[in-house]
């Protein structure tokens, strides 16, 4: 299987690569559009700001290639937010692959960023996580509101989408590569996923 991690220059690529390699898969980290198009699975990780990541994707001419993919794609953390239509972080238009918006988490007396372990409440139609109260590791100040594209939610002062999906595009607000057995199982299911 050909697994590609997109190099946005705004991500900790090494930890994601090691997590996939531990599952027995070879990984290519690239910003080459043809290699991304040819992949069986594409992972879009991200750390930093949506504005910087979108600038990098535009500079590398990866926006349209990412929009044209038909294979399973997994956006992680900022990568999930990039799949949405817009982010309040820098007031930037994103890839618009999942018609949702990324907004700043409300200040509910809890520290921001939301950093640490939290539970997931997956929906019945989530092909990547099937157990409630699965603990995952989060680091974020922006989130997607729960809507029809939500396949798992979490709570931190307010309920937010911890996983989203539209067609072949999946997003995880948390870091599966840092989320122990739950994250490992999610990555394994993503890599073995068959789309209908």
Swiss-Prot record:
Location within or outside the cell: Cytoplasm
EC number: 4.3.2.10, 3.5.1.2
Matching Pfam families: GATase (PF00117)
Pathway this chain belongs to: Amino-acid biosynthesis; L-histidine biosynthesis; L-histidine from 5-phospho-alpha-D-ribose 1-diphosphate: step 5/9
Ranges that cross the membrane: none
Major place of residence: cytoplasm
Domain Glutamine amidotransferase type-1: 2-196
InterPro entries, per the entry: Class_I_gatase-like (IPR029062), GATASE (IPR017926), Imidazole-glycPsynth_HisH (IPR010139)
PROSITE patterns: GATASE_TYPE_1
Quaternary structure, from the entry: Heterodimer of HisH and HisF.
Protein task: IGPS catalyzes the conversion of PRFAR and glutamine to IGP, AICAR and glutamate. The HisH subunit catalyzes the hydrolysis of glutamine to glutamate and ammonia as part of the synthesis of IGP and AICAR. The resulting ammonia molecule is channeled to the active site of HisF.
Protein known as: Imidazole glycerol phosphate synthase subunit HisH
Source organism of this protein record: Idiomarina loihiensis (strain ATCC BAA-735 / DSM 15497 / L2-TR)
Species lineage: Bacteria, Pseudomonadati, Pseudomonadota, Gammaproteobacteria, Alteromonadales
Gene: hisH
